[in-house]
């Protein structure tokens, strides 16, 4: 196993992760409804997002929360997303950057869930 070092590593974990997502019984249908056809534009955007988040490389443009706000997702969906994400990272990588990547994903998921719950008038029920 190795550290996450560059865009090649990012592409590996992003592509494998979203294959798992598409085939997952809980979160797969949510993603497949939103992205019914060609996934490459989404994958390219996620490559750029993680490259910016982890290595400060410019190139990501977008508002990730705005894309998730209209979806019917809850804590169970976020927990499953994180489970698949962590599993993917752990299958290929170790070290500081692997842990940092998982921590960033967890922070982002928690923020998204909290904002969605506030939008829906729910109390904060973060489960992670």
In which residue ranges do the predicted regions lie?
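Core of compact, soluble alpha-helical bundle domains
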Residues: 1-128
């Amino acid at each position: 196993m190795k550290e996450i070092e560059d865009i090649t590593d990012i592409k590996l974990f992003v592509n494998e992760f979203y294959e798992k997502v598409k085939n997952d019984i809980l979160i797969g249908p949510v993603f497949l409804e939103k992205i019914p056809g060609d996934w490459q534009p989404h994958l390219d955007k996620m490559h750029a997002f993680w490259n910016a988040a982890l290595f400060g490389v410019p190139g990501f443009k977008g508002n990730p929360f705005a894309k998730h706000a209209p979806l019917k997702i809850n804590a169970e969906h976020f927990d499953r997303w994180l489970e698949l994400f962590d599993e993917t990272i752990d299958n290929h990588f170790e070290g500081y950057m692997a842990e940092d990547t998982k921590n960033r994903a967890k922070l982002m998921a928690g923020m998204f869930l909290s904002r969605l719950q506030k939008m829906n008038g729910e109390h904060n029920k973060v489960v992670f």
